[in-house]
Amino acid sequence: MKALIYENYAQDDDFESILELRDILEPVPKPNDIIFRVKAAALNYDDIWGMRGKPLAVPLPHISGTDAAGEVIAIGNNVKNIKVGDRIVSHGNISCRVCTACTDGREYDCRQRKIWGFETGPLWGGYCEIAHLPEINVVKIPDNVSYEE
């Protein structure tokens, strides 16, 4: 599959000079993961920060894309609420799910929280043809809402 990868940080916001379209291996679902074909991906400030390498540096090489939507094409064995064919959008806060903040429903306060496509290392972001996330980090979108919306 194709992915937009960078191995260096942009100088003077020259993002074109660092981005390269490459072939990479398709993800395989872990028990709690969903795999989806990316239909739309947005550019937000986390992606810009990642490509700049500041204020926080992402691990390199890197695939950004903190916001993506698409169609589910595979699921892990433990996935319960998402099925192949569902239309989903990413929810990029990856948290531990076991600390007090997480169990109280405040995942945004998790001290181990990471942002998908920004600081999750091998859990690449959505600037690729096929992406993966834990089931808890996707939300179904209704048929009357486009992927771009």
Predicted regions span which residues?
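Short polar catalytic/cofactor-binding loops
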Residues: E7-D12, A41-L43
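Cytochrome P450 core scaffold surrounding the K-helix E-X-X-R motif
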Residues: Y45-R52
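Iron-sulfur (Fe-S) cluster-binding segments and ferredoxin-like electron-carrier domains
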Residues: T103-G121
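C-terminal boundary of histidine-terminating zinc-finger modules
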Residues: E149
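Glycine-rich beta-strand-centered segment in the early N-terminal region that forms part
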Residues: L25-A42, K54-T103, W124, H132, ...
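Short glycine/threonine/proline-enriched tight-turn/helix- or strand-capping micro-motif at secondary-structure
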Residues: D14-L25
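Extreme N-terminal starter segment of soluble prokaryotic enzymes
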Residues: M1-K2
